[in-house]
């Protein structure tokens, strides 16, 4: 049987010094026979999704200790993409994913932890911890801080979120008072932003991967039911320790759970719920850490066969994550996918022997279990707060309408093809990504003239000064992982296009990426990126570009000979922006850029250079 990793530092006379230090943390003689379980928290007062996490690590720790383990908590960094957006702060967001993954690895391996509980929530924290858990491959459970409640105001007949505030602020017809009212109401509570943005998408995907408990992605941060998720995470990690160290059960380990089939399940869910395009980036990165050969080609294949069964903000103003929970949460969507034979139900999870067994237990349509129904009635209270577990509101009924509700069955899908698509062509030879869930059907085929910008800042200036006209395709390049560096999100350009009334009249194409809050014909992750010699760097103002989502194609309409000629010219001058940028790139960011791969590889480090 496997031995506790922690014995390396707790067993034998030669470890007397290490034990002395362990004792200084509060450990006693009996504790040296127990599993030492690391709790990776991510509390910070900078991020609304993390402001309430301060005491939650100790909540998990006390449960672990009650059940016979030793719990040791540490913290990782956490960047708020919304606060970092629109300025050079966004250069640090994606690189922070690698820092988080490394820091969890460093702490767990330096101290020989036997298992891990990951308390994550926002955009790069869940992916970073996911990468670390698959790299370490020790028993691991994820539990997130939970989604924010949606905002409300008398100025709108729909719920609000961060994007509403951004779009209204750029609308010249909106008064300062109106903007201020929406701003104050858009983000009322602690938690990750209330739509199907990147943070919530990733927390939902951990359910499909099998690494978190049901409800992890959908119980709002303020609800008392989420406390039980944290306690259950402590219980579950102890059970996983017993299964691995006591019975050598490989399905107690992250790599035994997050198999190729599980990654297919995760992206199938992602496509069905119209998740953020960033999830593709992060799943590709996580798969590499798991040593699973899961690629853009697999995503492309699945995207053609999976319908969209759930539509949530920013793809509609009608529903937010709290509404997904009322409709049965992620297991409600998984159940419909299983009924359509689109899931691998024989894969393991941290809480059930198989995903199929879990669906049978947690599907509100298939079960009569009143406890399950009560769980999914957990709702929002509409009271501004930064306190976790502070309310116990429940909906009077569940949303079980699979014809016109928040979650649909296969027959009544929002669209027969899913919410994400991979496009290929002569300006994205290794692929690019579009969230079709946010694209109006009238522009699924779009042809326009290119207007090229060498940075996000230049594009924002151009959009706000009316350089961009109907029928144009805005090209923003040298914003990839290497070229940015850091692959900035383009939420401001897309939001400003909407505020200018161009959301259905223009497209945007970039080697950068998009916030989960983005909608419209926004195509990102162009690979190879411009800084790596990608053909997006060869596009010129006025070039005609054709986008064909049904055919999964994107091409600049010039000859191969012209492209080849331009490539020779570009090689001669180097793959760098044509206009100088005032951007300050620190040595830390330069180090990231040296090793960064393009988006089709998950923007992970190029290990061949190590």
Curated annotation (Swiss-Prot):
Catalytic activity: (2R)-2,3-dihydroxy-3-methylbutanoate = 3-methyl-2-oxobutanoate + H2O; (2R,3R)-2,3-dihydroxy-3-methylpentanoate = (S)-3-methyl-2-oxopentanoate + H2O
Keywords, in A-Z order: 2Fe-2S, Amino-acid biosynthesis, Branched-chain amino acid biosynthesis, Iron, Iron-sulfur, Lyase, Magnesium, Metal-binding
Pathway named in the protein's UniProt entry: Amino-acid biosynthesis; L-isoleucine biosynthesis; L-isoleucine from 2-oxobutanoate: step 3/4; Amino-acid biosynthesis; L-valine biosynthesis; L-valine from pyruvate: step 3/4
EC assignment: 4.2.1.9
UniProt GO MF annotations: 2 iron, 2 sulfur cluster binding; dihydroxy-acid dehydratase activity; magnesium ion binding
Cofactor: [2Fe-2S] cluster; Mg(2+)
Keyword Membrane among record annotations: no
Positions of Mg(2+) binding: 81, 123-124, 489
Pfam families, sorted: ILV_EDD_C, ILVD_EDD_N
Superkingdom of this protein's organism: Bacteria
One GO BP annotation of this record: isoleucine biosynthetic process
NCBIfam families for this protein: ilvD, PRK12448.1
Oligomeric and partner information: Homodimer.
Family statement drawn from the similarity comment of this UniProt entry: Belongs to the IlvD/Edd family.
Protein name: Dihydroxy-acid dehydratase
Organism: Xylella fastidiosa (strain Temecula1 / ATCC 700964)
């Amino acid at each position: 049987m496997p031995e506790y990793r922690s014995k390396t530092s707790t067993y034998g006379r030669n470890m007397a010094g290490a034990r002395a230090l362990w004792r200084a943390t509060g450990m006693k003689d009996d504790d040296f026979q127990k599993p030492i379980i690391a709790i990776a928290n991510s509390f910070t007062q900078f991020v609304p999704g993390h402001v309430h996490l301060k005491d939650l690590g100790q909540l998990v720790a006390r449960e672990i200790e009650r059940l016979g383990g030793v719990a040791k908590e540490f913290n990782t960094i956490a960047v708020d993409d919304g606060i970092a957006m629109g300025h050079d702060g966004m250069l640090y967001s994606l690189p922070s994913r690698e820092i988080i993954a490394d820091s969890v690895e460093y702490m767990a391996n330096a101290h020989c932890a036997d298992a891990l509980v990951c308390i994550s929530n926002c955009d790069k924290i869940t992916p970073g911890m996911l990468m670390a858990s698959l790299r370490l491959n020790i028993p691991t459970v994820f539990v997130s801080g939970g989604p924010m409640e949606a905002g409300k105001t008398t100025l709108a007949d729909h719920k609000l979120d961060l994007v509403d505030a951004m779009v209204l602020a750029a609308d010249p017809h909106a008064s300062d008072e109106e903007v201020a009212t929406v701003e104050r109401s858009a983000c009322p509570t602690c938690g990750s932003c209330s739509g199907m943005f990147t943070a919530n998408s990733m927390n939902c995907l951990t359910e499909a991967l099998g690494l978190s408990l049901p409800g992890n992605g959908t119980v709002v941060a303020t609800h008392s039911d989420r406390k039980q998720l944290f306690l259950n995470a402590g219980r579950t990690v102890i059970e996983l320790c017993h299964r691995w160290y006591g019975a050598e059960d490989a399905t107690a380990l992250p790599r035994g759970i997050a198999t190729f089939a599980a990654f297919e399940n995760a992206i199938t869910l992602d496509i069905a719920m119209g998740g953020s395009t960033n999830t593709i980036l992060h799943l590709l990165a996580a798969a590499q850490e798991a040593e699973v050969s899961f690629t853009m080609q697999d995503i492309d294949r699945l995207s053609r066969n999976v319908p969209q069964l759930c539509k949530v903000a920013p793809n509609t103003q009608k529903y937010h994550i709290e509404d997904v929970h009322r409709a049965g949460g992620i297991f409600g969507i998984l159940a419909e996918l299983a009924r359509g034979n689109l899931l691998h139900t024989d894969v393991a999870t941290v809480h059930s022997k198989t995903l199929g067994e879990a669906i049978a237990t947690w599907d509100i349509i298939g079960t009569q279990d009143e406890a399950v129904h009560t769980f999914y009635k957990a709702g929002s209270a509409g009271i501004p707060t930064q306190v976790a577990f502070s309310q116990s509101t429940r909906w009077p009924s569940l949303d079980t309408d699979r014809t016109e509700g928040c979650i649909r069955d296969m027959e009544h899908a929002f669209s027969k093809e899913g919410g994400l698509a991979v496009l290929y062509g002569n300006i994205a030879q290794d692929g690019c990504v579009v969230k079709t869930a946010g694209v109006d059907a009238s522009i699924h085929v779009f042809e326009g003239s290119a207007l090229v910008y060498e940075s996000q800042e230049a594009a924002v200036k151009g959009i706000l000064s009316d350089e961009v006209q109907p029928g144009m395709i805005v090209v923003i390049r040298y914003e990839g992982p290497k070229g940015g560096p850091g692959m900035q999100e383009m939420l401001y350009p897309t939001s400003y296009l909407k505020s200018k009334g161009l959301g259905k009249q223009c497209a945007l194409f970039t080697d950068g990426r998009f916030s989960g809050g983005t909608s419209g014909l926004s195509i990102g992750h162009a690979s190879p990126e411009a800084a790596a010699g990608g053909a997006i760097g060869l596009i010129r103002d006025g070039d005609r570009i054709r986008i064909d989502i049904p055919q999964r194609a994107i091409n600049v309409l010039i000859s191969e000979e012209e492209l080849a000629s331009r490539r020779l010219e570009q090689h001669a001058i180097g793959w760098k922006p044509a206009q100088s940028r005032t951007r300050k790139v620190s040595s830390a960011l330069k180090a990231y850029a040296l090793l960064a791969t393009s988006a089709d590889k998950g923007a992970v480090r190029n290990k061949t250079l190590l």
